[in-house]
Regions:
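Charge-dense, helix-prone N-terminal extensions
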Residues: 1-120
């Protein structure tokens, strides 16, 4: 049973990683406290500790909205910061929610295309 759970958990991280790395300019590297960190240019989008926990930084107003909605928890180590924690408890069913949080952060950090650039 443990082997099956371990295999399924690896699948979750693989699916999230594959999706995030398909986005322009996103890279992945080992996180300093364990897990896998995702970055856009030099800024951290967030990181995943194994297949059980995703941590992402947001501006405080966004963080508060997410926590107040019940979608996420305050960060498990720094609860008063802008960081949030999303506990992966529903297996593969949590993948869309984790990806959506990373997309929110990505949209905040990706370079903005100016009207002048768009006309080129």
């Amino acid at each position: 049973m443990l082997v099956i759970i371990t295999i399924l958990m690896g699948i979750i991280l693989d699916k999230i990683r594959d999706e995030l790395l398909s986005w322009p300019d996103v890279t992945a590297e080992p996180h300093r406290f364990g897990g896998l960190e995702f970055r856009i240019h030099k800024r951290e989008l967030g990181h995943i500790h194994g297949d059980r926990l995703a941590d992402l930084p947001f501006p405080m107003d966004t963080r508060n909205e997410l926590v107040d909605s019940g979608r996420v928890s305050p960060h498990h180590v720094m609860p008063k910061s802008g960081w949030i924690s999303y506990w992966i408890t529903q297996g593969e069913n949590d993948i869309p929610s984790v990806v959506e949080l990373f997309r929110m952060r990505y949209d905040q950090l990706k370079p903005k295309t100016s009207l002048k650039d768009a006309q080129k």
